[in-house]
Regions:
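Conserved, structured C-terminal
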Residues: 1-187
Length: 187
């Protein structure tokens, strides 16, 4: 899952450079990937993007409260943040046998308790993975839930902490270069 992105100037021959990198990389087991793999890694790492935020999301909701300097004398939004719940409501979710559909609610029995912010298949974990926002911060890691998948079926899932694995960042630093061989349903 170690990967690189290359940014070139307009005057560079991107096709020629890409072919050269590909030829050399094949000798070392390089494979081409795309958006689904990067989406999986982003979700597994707990990196949030546009679908994880809306106008009501506080830094605390997103698990980013440690970046808020409440001891600063004054800043825009301070009063609202002082009143806000300081607990994180953002967690990971592993879906057994399917991929949760983004925007769907998460439930326990008849109770709707959260929302899927983003999701995909994880070839590394061999299950669907998602970033979710819970209504109640107490419904966190190890909570077993139900969610609707991209195929319309209902799946069992379990909430988990973020990052989902590699909390030491070994993959990003190139210290873990294991390539998963699990199923890849986006092919």
């Amino acid at each position: 899952e170690l990967g690189w992105e290359f940014y070139l100037r307009p005057e560079n021959d991107a096709h020629k450079i890409g072919n050269h990198i590909w030829e050399i990389g094949l000798k070392y087991g390089m494979i081409l990937t795309g958006t689904p793999v990067f989406r999986a890694r982003r979700i597994e790492a707990g990196l949030m993007g546009t679908t994880e935020f809306d106008s009501t999301t506080t830094p605390f909701d997103a698990g980013l409260g440690h970046f808020v300097q409440m001891d600063k004398q004054n800043f825009i939004g301070r009063e609202a943040l002082e009143k806000a719940d300081k607990r994180s409501r953002t967690f990971g979710m592993r879906v057994l046998g399917g991929i949760a559909e983004r925007g769907r609610t998460i439930s326990i029995g008849d109770d709707l308790i959260g929302t899927v912010c983003s999701s995909t298949w994880s070839p590394y974990q061999e299950c669907g993975v998602a970033l979710v926002r819970m209504d109640d911060p107490e419904k966190g890691p190890s909570t077993e839930v139900k969610v609707t998948g991209t195929d319309g079926k209902t799946y069992s899932a379990k909430l988990c902490s973020l990052p989902m694995y590699d909390s030491e960042g070994a993959i990003a630093r190139g210290k873990n270069t294991t390539i998963p061989n699990g199923p890849q349903p986006w092919k």
